[in-house]
Amino acid sequence: MANFVLKAEKREDLGTGASRRLRRAGKIPAVIYGGEKEAVSVLLDHDKVLHSTEDKEFFSSEITLDIDGKQEKVIIKALQRHPYKVKLIHADFMRV
């Protein structure tokens, strides 16, 4: 079983315009929810996530998100892709 570790950063700037700016900068907006904690908006590096999705185990394995130095165990619940480009739009993660 593969061990997936992705670096993430909390994001304060929310909304459609902010998400578009992130995507142009090579980032993916994402949300982490579940458990007893509040939902957290984060951003991830597009190329690293896209490369991870090439491994089929990514979608069924536990993923470790390193959010500003703090480790969080999650699974991927949703991944939105661009209709015709090889580009990711948004990701939803659920805490384990």
From Swiss-Prot:
Keywords attached to this entry: Ribonucleoprotein, Ribosomal protein, RNA-binding, rRNA-binding
rRNA-binding keyword on record: yes
GO biological process, one term: translation
Described purpose of this protein according to its UniProt entry: This is one of the proteins that binds to the 5S RNA in the ribosome where it forms part of the central protuberance.
Gene3D superfamilies, sorted: Ribosomal Protein L25, Chain P
PANTHER family in the cross-refs: RIBOSOMAL PROTEIN L25/GLN-TRNA SYNTHETASE, ANTI-CODON-BINDING DOMAIN-CONTAINING PROTEIN, RIBOSOMAL PROTEIN L25_GLN-TRNA SYNTHETASE, ANTI-CODON-BINDING DOMAIN-CONTAINING PROTEIN
Protein name: Large ribosomal subunit protein bL25
One Gene Ontology term of the molecular function aspect: 5S rRNA binding
UniProt xrefs under Pfam families: Ribosomal_L25p
Species this chain originates from: Francisella tularensis subsp. holarctica (strain LVS)
Family note: Belongs to the bacterial ribosomal protein bL25 family.
GO terms for cellular component: cytosolic large ribosomal subunit
Assembly: Part of the 50S ribosomal subunit; part of the 5S rRNA/L5/L18/L25 subcomplex. Contacts the 5S rRNA. Binds to the 5S rRNA independently of L5 and L18.
